[in-house]
């Protein structure tokens, strides 16, 4: 239970989840004619469709050469990461109409494998949650300086370990 709670706390703090949900279909509103921000995609095997006329009928299926997954090579600052953006290339453009979700993506969402630092952060936070049972009302004990309190927030070491994976969402 502590491990599951720690894992969900890390997911919430980073704005992403570090497991694969399998293949699913999701809908997005393009940021502009060239870029669509998407949830974490762990595989290049996907189906991308758009509604060219804006009527919600996804009648245009894009070929692999019509788009580019980013970050390129699934790597940022030496860290292996999933794809989070799709860039239109060649002859296609994303439809942009009043922030409507006119992009349909069928893909494997999530992460292919859990990064080592996320696993370590989960272990640290889980042990903290487990030890929380020994600190009723957040008081871990009394020392020379008075009561020692246990924070209800993420452990500072955990925050540092997960910081490179934090994602701020700015898309629909």
Language model segments and positions:
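Divalent metal-cofactor coordination and adjacent catalytic microenvironments
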Residues: 1-172
